[in-house]
């Protein structure tokens, strides 16, 4: 697992609801689920990566965060994670606003 993911995992407490935005192949999600007993969900725009996550037994939906995050209720997750994805957005400020709205705590790494 990448060092960055190790740092993020140290921040997140056990038995929490976590949303991983731009979750990639689900490496961080799988760790948080198996080692910390977190209820982890993912949002990923790339169909092939969504399929990899599903094959790992992870709960991931395919979608664009700039369009999909608005649908999540306020403070519906204990933690929202955005790792190495911010630069990919056309409107990063709006994405950050949504992350702060959805999560009780938000973790962003660049």
Spans of features found by a protein language model:
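A short, conserved alpha-helix within the catalytic core of class I
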Residues: 89-98, 102
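Class I SAM-dependent methyltransferase SAM/SAH-binding core
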Residues: 27, 31-68
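Conserved beta-strand signature within the Rossmann-like core of class I S-adenosyl-L-methionine
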Residues: 103-110
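Short catalytic micro-motifs in class I SAM-dependent methyltransferases
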Residues: 84-85
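Conserved class I S-adenosyl-L-methionine
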Residues: 16-24
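Conserved alpha-helix/loop element of class I SAM-dependent methyltransferases that forms part
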Residues: 1-15
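Short conserved loop adjoining the S-adenosyl-L-methionine
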Residues: 68-74
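A conserved beta-strand element that flanks and buttresses the S-adenosyl-L-methionine
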Residues: 81
């Amino acid at each position: 697992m990448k060092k960055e993911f190790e740092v993020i995992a140290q921040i997140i407490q056990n038995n929490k609801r976590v949303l991983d935005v731009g979750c990639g192949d689900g490496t961080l999600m799988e760790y948080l689920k198996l080692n910390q007993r977190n209820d982890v969900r993912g949002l990923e725009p790339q169909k092939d990566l969504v399929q990899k996550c599903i094959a790992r037994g992870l709960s991931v939906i395919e979608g664009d965060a700039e369009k999909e995050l608005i649908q999540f209720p306020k403070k519906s997750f204990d933690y929202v994670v955005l790792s190495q994805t911010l630069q990919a957005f056309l409107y990063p400020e709006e994405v950050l606003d949504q992350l702060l709205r959805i999560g009780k705590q938000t973790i962003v790494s660049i």
